[in-house]
From Swiss-Prot:
Enzyme class: hydrolase
Name this polypeptide is given: Ribonuclease P protein component
Gene Ontology CC: ribonuclease P complex
Keywords, ordered alphabetically: Endonuclease, Hydrolase, Nuclease, RNA-binding, tRNA processing
Recorded coiled-coil stretches: none
Pfam name, any one: Ribonuclease_P
EC number per UniProt: 3.1.26.5
GO molecular function, one term: tRNA binding
Oligomer status and interactors: Consists of a catalytic RNA component (M1 or rnpB) and a protein subunit.
PANTHER family: RIBONUCLEASE P PROTEIN COMPONENT
Superkingdom, natural source: Bacteria
Protein's gene: rnpA
Amino acid sequence: MALPKANRLKSRKDFQAVFREGIRRNGSYLTLRALKPLYSRKPSLDTATQTTQPIESVHISSIRIGISISTKVSKRAVVRNRIKRQITSALYSLLPRLAPGWRLVFIVKPTAAESKCVSPQFLQELEQLLAQAEVFDGNS
């Protein structure tokens, strides 16, 4: 199942922001780059206290996910697309458990194609990486 359009990371600018400022978690088949929701320090009327408010409600409201798979993984587009579909399907099942506002990029490693990785393995590794990065809603 494909990710909803509201949950897709599309622009080059967004990908670059995640790579530049995000945290990194490594697994055997995937690498997760995650960028926490954007917050701004806005001064209140009382200068002694500062309040934190979201900069853009668009980025806070939904989680954005992108998948990067290089030709180093496989020269054949059929193989790369199959891996991408399996990861997307696993992410679709995890989507309701994820905290809003995060921007995530999953980078597929060449070991994913070499070991004939299947969907349950991707699901297990995705859960592990997301838990390490504390992306789950309520950090469950």
